[in-house]
Regions:
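Feature captures the catalytic ectodomains and active-site-proximal regions of enzymes
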Residues: 2-296
Length: 296
């Protein structure tokens, strides 16, 4: 694999080419989506769709453990590190850690990043989220202090996607509609959730493994505002449905989270609820059967 300075790396030209294996896996990581009790404080029951209404969802899914044997409320840094490495980050630290990974978790990601492991086994992989120009203005050292997904991608020495890639529909921004970018003054097209889902589907055929991260769920959950939470769930529902309608045959798609949040309007914090593991495509039954917690 060609190595260039991180500040010069762009994903649009480096990550193209045919997939060398027939099997493809896509992981849609949704921050802060737990399996609630279905009560009046649970917007997954009232948002107007059924994909994330666990009592009515026709998707193949099961709850998995996000606590990993550690007491307290699960948090982002440890949950995501466990998810992206397959190792129990909570047990390594002895507690749940919020925000971005600290030195110990960064080292775990540096050594055991799923993306890095795939590359070492001659598989193609991509973290398909588009990044704002500010990312390339940061020093390399600063980039290593960002989110677990960013560190996992850095550990694999994979390129990052730009807003030019977004405009060319080679990547998707984290909010899927580009509304956040437009409010910041960037000249990017406004997308519907359905259009963004179809863009993701068109691109996953280029890689053996694709990661996409959506975190508006966690932000909405912290507001405890029903209207905001229901709107985000509607958006995510439309995005995932459109993606599933357009995804290439032979693709196994997984959707999961790092901890609960949006499913309980009664608290501003995260929850101790299990998180969903949803699966579509060849091998979905085996994938669900093999997973009991974030490390699986």
């Amino acid at each position: 694999m060609t190595t260039r300075r991180e500040g010069e790396r762009r994903a649009g030209s480096d990550a193209s080419g045919p997939v060398r294996f027939s099997d493809r896996v896509v992981l849609i990581f949704v921050d802060g989506l737990g399996v609630g009790d279905g009560g009046r404080d649970d917007p997954t029951r009232t948002y107007g769709g059924d994909l994330f209404d666990w009592l009515r969802s026709r998707a193949s899914w099961q709850p998995i453990d996000a606590s990993l044997g550690i007491s307290g409320i699960p948090q982002s840094a440890t949950g995501q590190t466990s998810l992206f490495t397959g190792r129990n980050a909570q047990a390594v630290l002895g507690h749940h850690s919020t925000g971005f990974p600290g030195p110990v978790l960064r080292e775990m990601l540096r050594e055991h990043s799923l993306l890095k492991t795939l590359i070492e086994h001659s598989r193609s992989a991509a973290f398909l989220n588009a990044f704002r120009p500010l990312f390339w203005e940061l020093s390399e050292a600063k980039r290593w202090t960002l989110s677990a997904s960013t560190v996992a991608n850095l550990a694999a020495d994979l390129p990052f996607f730009t807003l030019d890639d977004l405009a060319s529909e080679r990547s998707v921004y984290q909010d899927v509609t580009n509304g956040d970018l437009r409010r910041r003054g960037f000249d990017v097209p406004e997308w519907t959730p359905g259009h963004a889902g179809r863009v993701l589907a068109r691109n996953v055929g280029r890689f053996d493994f694709t990661l996409f991260e959506y975190f508006k769920t966690d932000k909405a959950g912290h507001t405890q505002d029903r209207e905001s939470c229901e709107s985000v769930l509607q958006e995510l529902d439309g995005f995932v449905r459109a993606y599933l309608e357009a995804v290439p045959p032979g693709t196994l798609t997984l959707l999961t989270s790092d901890h609960g949040n949006i499913e309980d309007l009664g608290t501003r914090s995260h929850t101790t609820n299990p998180v969903p593991l949803m699966a579509w495509g060849p091998g979905e039954t085996d994938a669900l059967a093999a997973c009991a917690d974030l490390t699986d």
